[in-house]
Amino acid sequence: MTDRLSPERRRYLMQQVRSKNTRPEKAVRSLLHSIGYRFRLHRKDLPGTPDIVFPSRRLVLFVHGCFWHGHGCRIGQLPKSRLDYWSPKIEANRARDQRKEAALAAEGWRVAVVWQCELSDLGALEARLRNILDPS
């Protein structure tokens, strides 16, 4: 199946895909802030430049888009076209995520992932985040 968009238009649209300060990331940050947690953003001195960092808790949060990071939910399903491109791309993203998590764990950091689809139930996400941040 051919792309309905011109190469210039497709390039422009792909350039608009953000890697930092995405809508899901901002929603998680807003939720964390509203329940009283303070954090640091995008620490470049840590492996993988985590989205949200809690230095005193030695905890990092990655906010993953379900499609780009290959989550098993409905949003994370691969497109039906160009599987020869998308399958290796998403698998490479997943492998990179695992390497980043392993490197952080080796440095003594706890790692948690918040998936984009979890934002559909903010109450459950808040409870999960509280449990991660203050395990008792």
Curated annotation (Swiss-Prot):
Leader sequence segment: none
SUPFAM superfamilies: Restriction endonuclease-like
GO biological process: DNA restriction-modification system; mismatch repair
Top-rank EC class of the record's enzyme: hydrolase
Molecular function, one GO term: endonuclease activity
UniProt xrefs under CDD domains: Vsr
Function comment: May nick XorII sequences that contain T/G mispairs resulting from m5C-deamination. If unrepaired, these mismatches can lead to C-to-T transition mutations. The very short patch (VSP) repair process counteracts the mutagenic process by repairing the mismatches in favor of the G-containing strand. This enzyme is an endonuclease that nicks double-stranded DNA within the sequence CGATCG (C-methylation site unknown) next to the thymidine residue that is mismatched to 2'-deoxyguanosine. The incision is mismatch-dependent and strand-specific.
NCBIfam families documented for this protein: vsr (TIGR00632)
The protein, known as: Type II nicking enzyme V.XorIIP
Organism: Xanthomonas oryzae pv. oryzae (strain KACC10331 / KXO85)
Protein encoded by which gene: vsr
